[in-house]
Each structure stands twice: as structure tokens, then as C-alpha cells.
A protein has these predicted regions:
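Residues that act as N-cap/strand-start positions at coil-to-secondary-structure junctions
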Residues: 19, 76, 161, 223, ...
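Short glycine-aromatic motifs
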Residues: 162, 214, 224, 269, ...
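Structural preference for beta-rich elements and adjacent junctions enriched in aromatics
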Residues: 309-492
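Acidic-residue sensor for enzyme active/binding pockets
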Residues: 79, 181, 440
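Beta-rich carbohydrate-recognition and catalytic domains
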Residues: 1-19, 26-76, 84-157, 169-220, ...
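Beta-propeller and closely related beta-sheet repeat lectin domains
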Residues: 21-24, 78-81, 163-166, 225-228, ...
Length: 492
């Protein structure tokens, strides 16, 4: 489906082409899909703003058919992004270049001598896209400016930056967090940084054409381009950007403090985006720029990234019977599995007598060596000690329970531990494709020392390949034998 199709147009009595780029889409609260793309005239982009702008299409049947294309803004722009607020207001953020370039167009300045400037602006709709405010169809092509940063002055023109915007409404707040790319010229080269801005009043007051803002802002935090910002339901924010390679940083619930970058993709390219597909899973995408036999043959790279964090075990009534239907209200889990073909999710729950764990493993080739190890330690212990318990499950159910004795893990009587499993596949049969297994485990609280209502826990996955080699998957960079590194689990 070609949603926005390039087509021939006439500009100043000469042939030209309408071109589209940077489409963004979202599912609105009423179920419609809204898609918005930047458009421009191919030959006259820097001659007139009349044929530059934002185009919108809406589908009311899940994308099977689309309504007519509507122009919702005119003026030079790039990279629209859609955000809908809880009250239904739709905001379109975009790189705002029209007002600064318009006087230069009117003066007939050649494109090679023009001084472009950017910044981020928005237009709003409160009726699902029927009308827009401001409704900009003529000079000076000024929308509602929300962020711009002074870069330099050239030919008497103040040049601003802050572009490629991506905004979110932070969970359970009235604060909008906005990530942008900021571009400067250093020694004749473009240098790009990542900037964030914030608004607690829904950008109530717009900026003037030569005004910096907003006041609440973190400018030029790291080198990078094309940022994208998302937030998990549990509060953690995640910020991606491009620095030839796709970078991701995990942030706090206010999108102000971010950790070190990770590099989930191995190719180099440009642009990029993030999208949540589950409560703990975010998908990153980026163009993979490559040449094959001297020809440019770009591809799209995709990475699935899983969030692991502190979990509060919910109170639940669990029957240990190998069936996960009791776990509908216990959805938080630790996820492990990136180096092998297998993946596992482990969910906790609790009652007054036991802690419960549901291990769900996806595995297309089951063998006896395909185990998941669950480690439990007292929250007051930074090192392995006699309060550290290790449970091992596999396609045959619970296969081991051991306690650290000061030098190694020694098996203990597992009689008080309940376990039940469901197998989806055949063990050791290379001729079929398996699905995996499910194991429920109930651990008596009497086997655990729990300080400050909290444990530390860790998961390790082992996958035995058809060649007999075993691959170990761990939780990121967590050390399996250092409880101080493990994830907190609140159980009281």
C-alpha cells in the first residue's frame, strides 16, 4: 500500500513533482488510524512554501481503506510526530523551517545562498483531525513554536536549531517531555546533539521567531541525531538516537536522567524509531545503509529490547498444576534470552505461606539440557551466602534445589517445594519443531530469609544445541554470582 503517492504538479507554469517523506502514524482514542507525512515540491522546495507542508490521511477500518488526503499545514518542515493527550487533543510536532526561509524566498535569494533555520513547532486538533489550530496556509507559515535554541548568526539572520522532535506525555503527570536533535557548525562540519525539553502547561505560550526556549530544558547532552522517546507503563523512559549506530539509553520516570547507551544492532545507518509492543518490550528500528557490488541497497534493522526492573510480587491464589490461567493478574516478569534461540519469562506471585514462580520458556528444539536457573537471595546480601537458593527447572519440571554452602551450591531436600509442568514438544527429537515448556514452582517462605520485605533474584537460561554446545543467557550485564547485582523483588 502506497499511502502517500508522489505525483506530478505544476509550479509557476512548469512541471514539478510532489514528494512525501517522514510519515508518522498513531491509533487515535476513537480507533481511527491517523497518518501524517511531510510533503514538498521536488524542484521548488526553496522557491515557494506554497507546495511544502503536512498531509494527513485517516483510516476508520484498521488500515484497510483510507480517506482522502488533507493538507493540514503549509510551510517548509520535516519529520512530523503525532501525540494524543488523554483529553483527546492531538498534537503534531515537526521541524519548523518555514518562517525563517519565507522572507528569503520572497527576496528571490538563490537556494545556494539561503540561510536555513529550524526549531520545533506544533499544531493541534481537538476534533480528531477535522480542524487544526493554528491553521497555517499562508505566509509567514508560522505554527506554535515550542522549542528552539540559538546556534549562530549568518548574513544577519539568527539561526536556530532543535529539530526531529519526538514527544510523550509522562505517565501520571501533566508533563510533556520532548526529545530533539540540535545541530551546530563546528570547523565547517555539522555537529549533532540530543536535547530534551519539558512543559507542565501544554506549551501554553509559544516562542517568538527569535526567542530561545523553553526554560525547562536539557541542551546538547550527547552527540547524536534523530531521537525517539518512549515510556514503559512501569515508569522507565527509553531514549534512542543515531550516532552512525543505533543507541538506546534507559531513563528515569521524568525523562531527565539517563544511563549509559547500549547498542542493540550491529549495522550502521541513519534515522531510527522506538515503539512499545508489550508492557516490557520496546522495538527499535533503523535504516541499515549498505552497498552491495557498489549499489546502494538499504534495509531496515529491527531489535526487540526487553525491560527488566524491580518487581512487586502480587498477591494471588495459585494452584500449582502446570496451567498459567491463575496468573492473569500477575504480569510483571523478568525476561532472558538473546544469545540463544530460546527465551524465558519468569513471573512471581505470593501468598502468606509461599512465593510462586511461573517459568515460561520458548524453545524450538528441546533437550534435557535446556534449563532455567532461578536464584533467590536475601536483599541484605551483596554476595553469595547460606541464604542464597538456586532452583533449576527444565522440560522435565523441577530438577534441582540447592543452597550455597560457602563454596558451592549443595542440593537440599526439595520436599517442601511444589512444582508442576506442561511440555509443548518432544525432548531430544530433532525432526520436529517444539514450542517450549511451562513450569510452576511454589517455594515455602520458611526456606528463605527476607529482609526489609525484599529479595534479590536472578535468572539464567541454558540452551543445549544440536551439536551439544551449551549457550548461557543472562540478564544484561548482571553477574550470576553477585546478588548485589540482581533485581529487587518485593514480597511483603
Amino acid at each position: 500500500l502506497k499511502l502517500f503517492n508522489a505525483h506530478n504538479i505544476t509550479v509557476f507554469d512548469s512541471s514539478d513533482k510532489m514528494c512525501y517523506s517522514s510519515c508518522d502514524a498513531t491509533v487515535l482514542q476513537n480507533g481511527d488510524i491517523m497518518a501524517i507525512a511531510s510533503f514538498r515540491s521536488g524542484r521548488n522546495f526553496r522557491v515557494t512554501n506554497e507546495f511544502n507542508g503536512l498531509a494527513m490521511k485517516i483510516s476508520s477500518d484498521g488500515g484497510r481503506t483510507w480517506g482522502v488526503e488533507q493538507i493540514i499545514y503549509k510551510g517548509s518542515n520535516w519529520e512530523p510526530q503525532i501525540l494524543q493527550l488523554p483529553d483527546g487533543e492531538i498534537q503534531v510536532y515537526f521541524t519548523h523551517g518555514g518562517p525563517k526561509i519565507q522572507p528569503q524566498m520572497e527576496a528571490g535569494i538563490p537556494e545556494s545562498e539561503m540561510v536555513p533555520s529550524s526549531g520545533t513547532a506544533i499544531i493541534r486538533s481537538k476534533d480528531n483531525g477535522k480542524t487544526w489550530d493554528p491553521y497555517v496556509m499562508e505566509p509567514p507559515y508560522a505554527a506554535h513554536r515550542v522549542s528552539q535554541q540559538y546556534a549562530y548568526t549568518k548574513k544577519g539572520i539568527q539561526v536556530f536549531t532543535d529539530q526531529m522532535p519526538c514527544a510523550i506525555l509522562l505517565n501520571n503527570t501533566d508533563t510533556i517531555a520532548l526529545a530533539m536533535e540540535s545541530m551546530f557548525v563546528r570547523d565547517g562540519e555539522d555537529v549533532l546533539y540530543i536535547t530534551t525539553a519539558y512543559s507542565d502547561d501544554n506549551w501554553a505560550v509559544g516562542l517568538g521567531i527569535d526567542e530561545e526556549g523553553p526554560a525547562d530544558k536539557q541542551e546538547n547532552m550527547w552527540h547524536g541525531a534523530a531521537p525517539y522517546l518512549r515510556q514503559f507503563p512501569s515508569g522507565e523512559t527509553v531514549l534512542s538516537y543515531n550516532q552512525k549506530r543505533f543507541q538506546i539509553r534507559l531513563g528515569d520516570s521524568l525523562a531527565r536522567e539517563f544511563g549509559d547507551p547500549i547498542d542493540p544492532m550491529h549495522g550502521t545507518g541513519f534515522w531510527g524509531s522506538l515503539e512499545l509492543i508489550q508492557s516490557h518490550i520496546v522495538v527499535g528500528t533503523m535504516t541499515y545503509a549498505r552497498k552491495v557490488s557498489g549499489q546502494q541497497q538499504n534495509r531496515i534493522m529491527i531489535s526487540q529490547n526487553v525491560l527488566n526492573h524491580r518487581i512487586d510480587a502480587p498477591r494471588a491464589r495459585i494452584r500449582v498444576d502446570g496451567d498459567n490461567t491463575d496468573w492473569d493478574d500477575a504480569t510483571d516478569a523478568l525476561f532472558v534470552g538473546s544469545d540463544s534461540q530460546a527465551q524465558a519469562a519468569v513471573r512471581p506471585a505470593k501468598d502468606d505461606d509461599n512465593l510462586y514462580f511461573l517459568v515460561e520458556r520458548l524453545d524450538t528444539d528441546l533437550s534435557d539440557g535446556d534449563t532455567v536457573e532461578l536464584y533467590l537471595a536475601d536483599s541484605g546480601s551483596d554476595t553469595l551466602d547460606t541464604n542464597t537458593l538456586r532452583l533449576t527447572v527444565g522440560p522435565n519440571g523441577l530438577t534441582g534445589a540447592a543452597r550455597f554452602n560457602g563454596s558451592d551450591f549443595a542440593e537440599i531436600d526439595a520436599g517442601g517445594i511444589q512444582a508442576a509442568m506442561t511440555l509443548q514438544g518432544t525432548i531430544g527429537n530433532d525432526e520436529d519443531e517444539d514450542t517450549g515448556y511451562l513450569v510452576e514452582v511454589a517455594v515455602p517462605r520458611s526456606l528463605l530469609r527476607i529482609s526489609n520485605q525484599q529479595l534479590r533474584w536472578n535468572v539464567l537460561l541454558r540452551d543445549r544445541g544440536t551439536d551439544g554446545r551449551v549457550t548461557e543467557d543472562i540478564l544484561g550485564t548482571i553477574r550470576w554470582n553477585v546478588p548485589g547485582d540482581w533485581m529487587p523483588l518485593t514480597v511483603d
